[in-house]
C-alpha cells in the first residue's frame, strides 16, 4: 500500500517529495506511471483538457534536469469495456498517441512513442534512450493484465526502467499492474512517488 502524503524513516516524518533528493536519476532510465486519462474531442481526438498532463510536468522535468531518461506509461479510458463490434480493441479511439503532440508541446521537446507497453520492441526502445529523452508507451489498458493486477504483466512493465516513480495519485488506490504491482519489482531505493 502506498502512502501519498508522508513517509516515515528513522522515526522522522518527511514530505514525500523529499525522496527525490535520495534518488540519483543521472544516466538512469526511469519508469514513470502518469495519469494521462484526459478528455479528447470525439471527432478529432485532440486533447480538450490538458490539466492532468500539466500536472505531471514537474516530475518529468525534475528527472530530465537531473540527467535521467524516462518511459511514461498511462491508461486512457476503458478500451476493454468498449470493444468494437468485431470484438477488437478500438485502438484509434483509445491510443495514447493522441496525447503525444500536446505532451511534446507542453514539455518543449520531442517525445517518442512506442506502439505497445510490453514486449521486446518496446524494451529495446527503452534501452536505447539517452539522457534527456522521453518515451511514451501505449495504453496499459490494452492488456487484460493491467486492471487484473497481473504480476507477470507487471514484471514485463518493470523491464522498461531501473527506477519506478508513481506520479498517478488519482489511480494509486487501485491494485493495477502499472501502479501497485509493478512497484514490487523495485527495491526501496529505486522507487518513489512523484510530486503529485
Pin down the residues of each PLM region.
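Active-site loop-to-helix "anion-binding N-cap" substructures in soluble metabolic enzymes
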Residues: 2-196
Amino acid at each position: 500500500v502506498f502512502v501519498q502524503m508522508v513517509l516515515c524513516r528513522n522515526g522522522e516524518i518527511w514530505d514525500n517529495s523529499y525522496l527525490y533528493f535520495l534518488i540519483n536519476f543521472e544516466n538512469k532510465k526511469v519508469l514513470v506511471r502518469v495519469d494521462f486519462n484526459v478528455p479528447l474531442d470525439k471527432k478529432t481526438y485532440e486533447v480538450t483538457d490538458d490539466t492532468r498532463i500539466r500536472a505531471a510536468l514537474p516530475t518529468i522535468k525534475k528527472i530530465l534536469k537531473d540527467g535521467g531518461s524516462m518511459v511514461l506509461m498511462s491508461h486512457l479510458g476503458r478500451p476493454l469495456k468498449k470493444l468494437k463490434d468485431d470484438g477488437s480493441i478500438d485502438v484509434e479511439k483509445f491510443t495514447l498517441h493522441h496525447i503525444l503532440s500536446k505532451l511534446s508541446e507542453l514539455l518543449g521537446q520531442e517525445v517518442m512513442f512506442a506502439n505497445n507497453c510490453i514486449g521486446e520492441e518496446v524494451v529495446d526502445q527503452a534501452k536505447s534512450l539517452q539522457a534527456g529523452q522521453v518515451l511514451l508507451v501505449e495504453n496499459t489498458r490494452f492488456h487484460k493484465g493491467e486492471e487484473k493486477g497481473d504480476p507477470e504483466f507487471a514484471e514485463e512493465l518493470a523491464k522498461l526502467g531501473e527506477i519506478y516513480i508513481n506520479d498517478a495519485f488519482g489511480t494509486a488506490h487501485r491494485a493495477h499492474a502499472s501502479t501497485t504491482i509493478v512497484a514490487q519489482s523495485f527495491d526501496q531505493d529505486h522507487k518513489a512517488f512523484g510530486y503529485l
